[in-house]
Amino acid sequence: MKIRRCFPPLLALCIVLAPRYAQSQNQNVNNGSPVYVQQEGFVDANGVMIYYRILGRGEPLLIVHGGPGASHDYFLPYLLPLARHHKLVFIDERGSGRSQKLEDASGYTVENMVEDVEAVRVALRLGQVTLLGHSYGGALAQAYALKYQKNLSHLILGSTWSSTKALNEVFIRMKQNMSPELQQRIHNLESSGLFGHGKDYEKNRYTTEYMVAAWGEGYFPYLYQNRPDPNYDPVDNGKMSWELYREMWGEHGEFVVDGNLRSVEYTDRLSTIKVPTLILVGDHDECDPSLAEAMHQKIAESKLVVFPKAGHMTFVDQPEMFRKAVESFLMK
């Protein structure tokens, strides 16, 4: 194939004009344009490649996801309206989503993830940030605040917990509220061990039967209330980092946390958090409102919002209430 060469004068003109054109385009995007440019990449954080995704304008709002072992994807498209006034910085925690997975699962700890969040903040030159954590991400956000609150302007804790002991008590009550038939079915599956069953490709995750029983019949009333996601599939929910999940959550099912997340006992230390804090929870949340109330009582500069007709996915059940709660809090 014949390749045509650029004429040198034309090439020189292209080189001169390209940066100016790009700069002009960026200015247009940043000055009231309806176009929102997305940026993504990786930060080498303590030897682990952490994926980040940036979208929006304004002060940085750093967002950490739950699971543990999920990814930032479940926030979208629901948090997109916040990008109009805030620079949203999503990350996938180590071992999750697009971030690097570890050969040694013992490296999956809250403490290590705190250092990853800090490394991302420093590498991206974000300065002081608002940190928003949902579910497990809320526990991670608390751990970060307990060590690095000088780097926070605000803290937002969504559908989370500060005491794993208290969370396990919530799960006991959740099980007791199930039908006797479902309780027995889940008990039988958990008693026989949740891993190592089925086909070779199934042995390192929950069986389909358990996913349906636990994440479908068991959890669903606590995930959604007002706007149940018609695309929710408990089996699809199993697409996550299983080695991480087993290390952190544990191996004995959805209704007891007995992995290294047992270390999450922060309640008595929360009084040291002095940054303005917003605590969000659904009235039918998997992380019961009593857990949010316990955090609210300990953090002096906190505001508690309980969303009506909302489960764990508050920003899905009550998207406008969620947006207004976050934006009004950050305006103060």
Language-model-detected regions and their locations in the chain:
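Conserved HGGG/HGGXW glycine-rich cap/lid loop of the alpha/beta-hydrolase fold
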Residues: 48-101
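Short beta-strand/loop motif that positions the catalytic acidic residue
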Residues: 273, 279-281
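Active-site loop/oxyanion-hole signature of alpha/beta-hydrolase fold enzymes
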Residues: 93-136
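Catalytic active-site module of serine/aspartate enzymes centered on a nucleophile-bearing elbow/loop
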Residues: 302-332
